[in-house]
UniProtKB/Swiss-Prot annotation:
Pfam families noted in UniProt: Tyr_Deacylase
Protein name stated in the entry: D-aminoacyl-tRNA deacylase
UniProt-listed InterPro entries: Daa-tRNA_deacyls_DTD (IPR003732), DTD-like_sf (IPR023509)
Subunit-structure text: Homodimer.
Protein's UniProt keywords contain rRNA-binding: no
Database matches in NCBIfam families: D-aminoacyl-tRNA deacylase
GO cellular component labels: cytoplasm
Organism, scientific name: Oenococcus oeni (strain ATCC BAA-331 / PSU-1)
HAMAP family reported in the protein's UniProt record: Deacylase_Dtd (MF_00518)
Family, as annotated: Belongs to the DTD family.
Functional description taken from the UniProt entry: An aminoacyl-tRNA editing enzyme that deacylates mischarged D-aminoacyl-tRNAs. Also deacylates mischarged glycyl-tRNA(Ala), protecting cells against glycine mischarging by AlaRS. Acts via tRNA-based rather than protein-based catalysis; rejects L-amino acids rather than detecting D-amino acids in the active site. By recycling D-aminoacyl-tRNA to D-amino acids and free tRNA molecules, this enzyme counteracts the toxicity associated with the formation of D-aminoacyl-tRNA entities in vivo and helps enforce protein L-homochirality.
Length: 148
């Protein structure tokens, strides 16, 4: 699994004119899944993200987790995180998980985050979405279970 995490002040996702999810302070997660991903990757990333200390404490030091600040997560499926751009100018997505498998793993990941007592909003898997966010920091962290 590959995740791009951005710390935000607020964010929302919509399909067409319909807002599907929105949050205040928290994380936007762009979530990419490959065919070899499963429970081990889901559990590892849910645990890591739920305990990640990137919010400022009273001394302005990154020392608080999303749970500490009562933040929320906006989780967005993002198969393009597995783009291969080595050949030519058009990316290949052959390394991205097949849609059925990816959807199952994505749903399990969101549930694992909720099992860590996090509020999770989502977009629509496989849809063309518009994501609006206000970065805080900015803080952007990339997780890749192939490199843990």
């Amino acid at each position: 699994m590959r995740i791009v995490l951005q710390k935000v002040s607020s964010a929302q996702v919509s399909v067409g004119e319909k807002i599907l999810g929105e949050i205040g302070v928290g994380f936007v997660l762009l979530v990419g899944i490959e065919n070899t991903d499963g429970k081990e990757e889901v559990d590892y990333l849910a645990r890591k993200i739920s305990h990640l200390r990137v919010f400022a404490d009273q001394n302005d030091k990154m020392n608080l987790s999303i749970t500490d600040v009562k933040g929320s997560i906006l989780s967005i499926s993002q198969f393009t995180l597995y783009a291969d751009t080595k050949k030519g100018n058009r990316p290949s997505f052959i390394n991205a998980g097949d849609p059925e498998h990816a959807k199952t793993v994505y749903q399990a990941f969101n549930q694992a985050l909720m099992n860590h007592n996090l509020k999770v909003a989502t977009g629509e898997f496989g849809a063309h979405m518009e994501v609006k966010l206000e970065n805080d920091g900015p803080v952007t962290i990339i997780f890749d279970t192939d490199h843990k």
